[in-house]
Amino acid sequence: AELIGIGIGSTGPLDINKGIILECNNLPTLHNYPLHKKIESTFGLPVKLDNDANAMMLGEALWGAGRNLNSILGITLGTGLGAAIVVNRKIIRGATGCAGEIWLSPYKEGMIEDYVSGTGISNLYQRITKRKISGEEISKLAREGDINALKAWKEFTQALAYALSWTVNIVDPEVVIIGGSVMHSSDIFWDSMVSLFKKYICPQTAASIQLKPAGLKDNAGFMGAAALMFVE
């Protein structure tokens, strides 16, 4: 098949018109990086750039857990925290392109991303134990009943429920789709998170809203990025 272009789902926030990564909390060397220009000049093909959460949820809207639904809030739980709003299979970017950038919202002593992300769960465990280990190791310990790992996941769960409730009370979507690498540990936090989340939102919303894991799993971002070439 002929290659017609390259779609990219990048960490953000971005200036999509200029093709620049504006800021990156977890990868500071990418601040103001001209990604669009670099890729286009390297490959000589048209490039469409969007943030990774938007790309992932566009994929889910077209082929995954949001298929046949009209209003979607997507959350990505990876190294950082991302969110996306897709309505009628179109990404809602807002006036400046920053719609869904909930990661820097204030929470306790820092930002919500400091608590709700792969980095966040490691930070929470380190605060309790003074030991720095990976999220995968913390999940393993939690499944074995380790009290400190379970405490860290409990705080993560509370923070995630808060973050979802803030956003859902504003956007009122049909479905919340959650994806990203942290979802490999969803058996630890999912049921508790859903229960807490529904306490913090409007009763009418709680009665009808769906919460789903990403249906395309790790393929959602790739598929959504490719779709940018012909949907957007």
Report residues per predicted region.
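ATP-binding/phosphotransfer module of carbohydrate and carboxylate kinases, centering on a glycine-rich
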Residues: 1-5, 14-20, 37-45, 62-69, ...
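Short glycine-aspartate micro-motif
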Residues: 3-7, 48, 72-76, 82-84
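A cytosolic small-molecule/anion-sensing beta-strand core signal
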Residues: 10, 17, 51, 87-88
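A charged helix-plus-loop insertion that forms the helical arch/lid used to bind
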Residues: 19-31
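A short acidic/small-residue loop/turn micro-motif
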Residues: 29-30, 99-101
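Generic enzyme active-site microenvironment
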Residues: 50, 58
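Active-site glycine-centered loops adjacent to acidic/histidine catalytic or metal-binding residues
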Residues: 52, 78, 225
